[in-house]
């Protein structure tokens, strides 16, 4: 039995789809926070179980008879590590044999990316638990780029704060498929830590040029101070803590924390990952 947390989210849901595609008879539990949130999974051949990272007993109950756990990192801010720690403790108590965890590329306690420390602590907790593990250190999602770029097509410019440092972007569907590959052959990924990236990194200047070629409109990249980026995010109606988080992502990009390419994703998929150029064509050639 496999338990997928965050099952109604993009990454968890796509991982379920890939697992079922690989083996329609696979037994999957899908962890959701409420019956309401589980409704969109009703048409999938999975067992829906309700639980919450902060409700320890619900986690232990959800993990009954589970051999492998995909712990999709929480998107909740503030107590992310506490949530993960609960899940790891519950997994150990329930007798889970293997935890697959979705971390961040090159997880580093000194990262500019403010949530990196939560990932570092979670990785440490998993290793200290004695449960077998696989750490999937995912690079930045290409899927987030359109919202990062904003109205660049209309304004003619991408205003961001990543300097001209290159960033490796990978698509979420490739990451989900890699999760399914690992979970389906778990014995061969015991106690491994993988850096999950696409094949090539690009700067935001490169991205502006790519979008220009795709759309036929001249787009330039304008590097703005991080404080200006934060102000723009807040003006767009997002809360201050979200602005701080998004600014920290830009800061981490600027110092090269996402300028890394690794062959692991290609090896897991048995094909080249989707390149950023291909992804952008799918978004901006419509």
Locate the predicted segments by residue.
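NAD(P)H-binding glycine-rich loop region in Rossmannoid oxidoreductase-like domains
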Residues: 32-94, 108
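Glycine/proline-rich active-site loop of Rossmann-fold NAD(P)-dependent oxidoreductases
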Residues: 144-150, 182-193, 259, 286
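Substrate-binding strand-loop-helix patch
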Residues: 166-173, 197-213, 227-228, 274-275
């Amino acid at each position: 039995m496999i338990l997928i947390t965050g099952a109604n989210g993009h990454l968890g849901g796509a991982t379920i789809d890939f697992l079922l595609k690989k083996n329609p008879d696979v037994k999957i539990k899908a962890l959701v926070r409420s019956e309401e949130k589980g409704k969109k999974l009703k048409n999938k051949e999975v067992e829906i179980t309700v639980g919450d990272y902060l409700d320890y007993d619900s986690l232990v109950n959800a993990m009954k008879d589970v051999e492998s756990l995909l712990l999709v990192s929480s998107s909740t801010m503030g107590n992310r590590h506490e949530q993960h720690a609960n899940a790891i403790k519950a997994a150990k108590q329930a007798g889970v044999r293997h935890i697959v965890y979705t971390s961040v590329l090159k997880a580093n306690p000194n990262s500019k990316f403010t949530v990196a420390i939560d990932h570092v602590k979670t990785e440490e907790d998993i290793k200290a638990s004695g449960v077998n593990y696989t750490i999937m250190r995912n690079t930045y999602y290409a899927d987030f780029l359109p919202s990062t770029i904003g109205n660049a097509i209309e304004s003619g410019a991408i205003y961001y704060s990543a300097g001209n440092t290159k960033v490796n972007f990978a698509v979420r569907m490739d990451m989900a498929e890699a999760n399914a590959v690992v979970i389906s052959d778990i014995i061969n990924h015991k106690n491994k830590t993988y850096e999950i990236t696409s094949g090539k990194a690009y700067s935001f200047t490169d991205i502006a040029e790519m979008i220009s070629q795709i759309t036929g409109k001249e787009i330039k990249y304008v590097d703005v101070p991080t404080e200006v980026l934060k102000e723009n995010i807040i003006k767009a109606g997002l809360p201050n803590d979200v602005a701080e988080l998004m600014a920290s992502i830009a800061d981490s990009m600027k110092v090269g924390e996402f300028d890394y390419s690794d062959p692991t994703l290609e090896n897991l998929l048995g094909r080249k990952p989707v390149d950023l150029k291909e992804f952008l064509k799918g978004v901006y050639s419509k």
